[in-house]
Structure formats: structure tokens, C-alpha cells
């Protein structure tokens, strides 16, 4: 279930981790790049609703990550592709969410959710698999929730060097490229 602080409840299928999470609910309109969204530190403290209807079709390619781990507290999709089609794929999005403890929900009307968020602004919500939730207990928790100190959460503790990961980059300087 996805429960919003305004009382709206969406019923879907659990994806990723089955842990319960309260988070700020936001949406992203990208047609591709869900891995970049998942690994973008600017989404820390938020659960991201992807507006494009099919997510996961090219799987997870770890070389394409923006950072070493996913940052959103939750992930919301209309339809999750369970069989990726990509020769570079390391794992499915389901496996990636599970191994990183990120809960999510699939099978909900993400257009309706996006319309609510667009009209009312971002709001807090809960992703839960608890069928016996009590709305009268959940809503006050949602209204009280704050994202906390997300800058501290995403900031590196020590500097580090990022080494080239592709064969092309390891063979020396790239020619014929313009940097803007």
C-alpha cells in the first residue's frame, strides 16, 4: 500500500524490500534513466514515483550508477519489467532494490498519484505491506515526518578517486570529443 498524508491510499504489489518506510513522495517524468534516478543523492529522504509506465526494461548496469548505492527511501512504478533486455545488465531492478533494502510498490495508477502531487505539492507517504494498517494511526505519523539532515547523509566522509571503468577510458585520452 501507498498511504498519503492527505488520506489517499493506493493498492499495489510490493517490490524490492518489504520493510515499511515513511518518506516525502515526489515524482520524476524521465522516460529513461531510472538507474540514474535511483542512484542520484538528491533523492535522499524521498520516495520517487516514476511517471513513465514501464520501468526496469533494461535492468541495472552498475557501471551507469551515479553513486555507489540507491538514495531514495522508496520507489513507485506503474509496471515493473521483471525480465530486462540488455547485454550489459548486471541484475533486475527487483534484485537491486532487494539487495539495497529499498521498498517499493508497483501496479498503482502513477498518473493519478502524479496529479495529486502536482496539484497539492509533495507530501509525505508510507509504503507498507501491512494489510491491517490503521489510517487513524498512520496519518499523524505522516504529518509529523521530516526528511531530516539529508545533506549530511549523502556527503562523502573522505575524498576518493574514481577510476575509469570502461575499456575505452582505460586506453588513454578520448579523441574526437568536445567538452562543453
Identify the residue ranges that each predicted region occupies.
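RNA-binding accessory domains that recognize and position tRNA/RNA substrates
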Residues: 1-180
Amino acid at each position: 500500500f501507498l498511504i498519503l498524508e492527505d488520506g489517499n491510499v493506493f493498492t499495489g504489489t510490493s517490490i524490492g524490500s518489504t520493510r515499511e518506510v515513511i518518506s516525502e513522495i515526489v515524482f520524476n517524468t524521465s522516460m529513461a534513466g531510472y538507474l540514474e534516478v535511483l542512484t542520484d543523492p538528491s533523492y535522499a529522504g524521498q520516495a520517487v514515483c516514476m511517471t513513465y509506465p514501464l520501468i526496469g526494461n533494461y535492468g541495472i548496469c552498475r557501471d551507469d550508477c551515479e553513486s555507489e548505492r540507491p538514495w531514495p527511501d522508496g520507489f513507485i512504478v506503474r509496471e515493473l519489467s521483471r525480465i530486462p533486455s540488455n547485454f550489459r545488465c548486471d541484475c533486475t531492478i527487483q534484485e537491486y532494490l532487494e539487495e539495497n533494502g529499498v521498498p517499493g510498490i508497483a501496479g498503482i495508477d502513477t498518473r493519478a498519484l502524479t496529479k495529486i502531487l502536482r496539484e497539492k505539492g509533495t507530501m509525505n507517504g508510507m509504503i507498507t505491506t501491512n494489510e491491517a494498517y490503521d489510517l487513524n494511526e498512520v496519518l499523524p505519523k505522516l504529518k509529523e515526518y521530516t526528511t531530516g539532515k539529508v545533506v549530511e547523509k549523502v556527503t562523502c566522509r573522505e575524498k576518493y578517486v574514481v577510476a575509469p571503468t570502461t575499456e575505452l577510458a582505460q586506453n588513454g585520452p578520448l579523441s574526437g570529443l568536445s567538452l562543453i
